[in-house]
UniProtKB/Swiss-Prot annotation:
This is Putative uncharacterized protein YjhR. Keywords: Hydrolase. GO terms for biological process: phosphorus metabolic process. One of its GO terms (molecular function) is hydrolase activity. The lineage of its organism: Bacteria, Pseudomonadati, Pseudomonadota, Gammaproteobacteria, Enterobacterales. It holds the Pfam family PLDc_2. PROSITE patterns: PLD. It comes from Escherichia coli (strain K12). Residues 276-303 form the PLD phosphodiesterase domain. The gene is yjhR. It comes from the Bacteria.
Length: 338
């Protein structure tokens, strides 16, 4: 099993079926990027190897449209890749099944738990790999006994299950008054956060699933936060307790717990509010109410050594159009705070 966390938004027009444009666009882009590798590995064309399933017909159409735009499911293909609702794959199997849940942190998504066959059928159709493309923060929040809770147990059983892929733009956050830019790699991310701390007017929130005091010092973030606090800027750091302390060895886990406690205490002494939450996958920076940065970069834990660096990307949205999204993010965090 595997997953790609996508900070999208599930939508439902009046009387219509639900869809999530960012999930659809990301699935299409991911298939384009991996098509050659998949076909080489299996010795078969993509449509014989991969199936894409989702609970909603509108999402089926959104995924098909995204595939056509990238010319991966067009007339030149030997056959059409199967994209359908969960029941369209009953009686058929694929080596790789991609699942688009559609729901996001903006709504609960109980429908996925109302009928256990939805996820059971989807998972059972995958012979080799079942990959979920969606908002993992929502899946992670569910009770352990629910269908989504059981799925979360297996998806998050290993850090190796997390897929890495470049973030796609959220079209619903873009308007004529929105400025958007992209960050690539460690240096651009570090420069961005230091500049954002220096320019913040009221408050800044940094969501980083992992927190390493060494990285906070090494990057200059500590000094930048201290200067921001001296100007009266409210700073909140949100991190995941389990991510920071998880280890199979009890002694190692206690050691990691001590390091986390120490980091939290130091931040609190600086006047920086630190919130521990249950299982957060988003990596986000929010400045006041008009800047939102979303991506794959772990702000307070990413390695800065060249040979170990990952090529992370983030998207920065500036403008009034992000206010509602920021409100939804804060609401989701409140639900999972310890």
């Amino acid at each position: 099993m595997g997953y790609l966390h996508i900070d999208g938004r599930g939508m439902k027009p009046n009387g219509g079926s639900r869809h999530n444009p960012l999930e659809a666009e990301t699935i299409a882009a991911w298939l384009v990027a991996h098509k050659d590798d998949i076909e080489r590995h299996y010795g078969e064309p993509l449509y014989k190897v991969v199936g894409v399933v989702t609970p909603f017909s509108a999402q089926v159409n959104a995924i098909k449209m995204s595939l056509r735009k990238l010319e991966i499911n067009g007339k030149d293909e030997q056959g059409l890749l199967t994209v359908g609702t969960v029941h369209s794959l009953q009686g058929a199997e694929r080596a790789i099944v991609l699942f688009s849940p559609v729901y996001s942190k903006h709504e609960d998504g109980r429908f996925l738990d109302s009928n256990s066959t939805i996820l059971n059928v989807a998972v059972s159709r995958a012979k080799d790999s079942f990959l979920v493309f969606g908002d993992m923060d929502l899946i992670e929040m569910q009770p352990a006994f629910s269908p989504r809770g059981l799925l979360a147990k297996y998806l998050f059983s290993s850090d190796n299950n997390a897929l890495q892929f470049e973030f796609q733009k959220r079209q619903d956050l873009i308007s004529a008054h929105t400025q958007i830019s992209t960050l690539h790699g460690v240096e651009q991310h570090d420069e961005f956060l230091n500049k954002t701390l220096a320019g913040a007017q009221k408050k800044i929130t940094i969501i980083s699933p992992w927190l390493s005091w060494q990285k906070v010092e090494q990057t200059g973030f500590l000094a930048s936060m201290a200067l921001a606090r001296s100007r009266g800027i409210d700073i909140t750091v949100v991190t995941d307790k389990n991510c920071n302390i998880a280890h199979v060895d009890d002694d190692k886990r206690q050691e990691k717990q001590h390091l986390l406690n120490d980091a939290v205490e130091k931040l609190n002494k600086m006047g920086i509010a630190t919130k521990l939450v249950n299982r957060v996958h988003s990596k986000i920076v929010i400045e006041d109410e008009e800047l939102l940065c979303v991506g794959s970069f772990n702000w307070f834990s990413a390695t800065r050594e060249d040979k170990y660096q990952r090529y992370d990307t983030s998207l920065v949205y500036r403008g009034e159009g992000v206010k509602n999204e920021i409100k939804a993010i804060y609401g989701s965090l409140d639900q999972r705070q310890l």
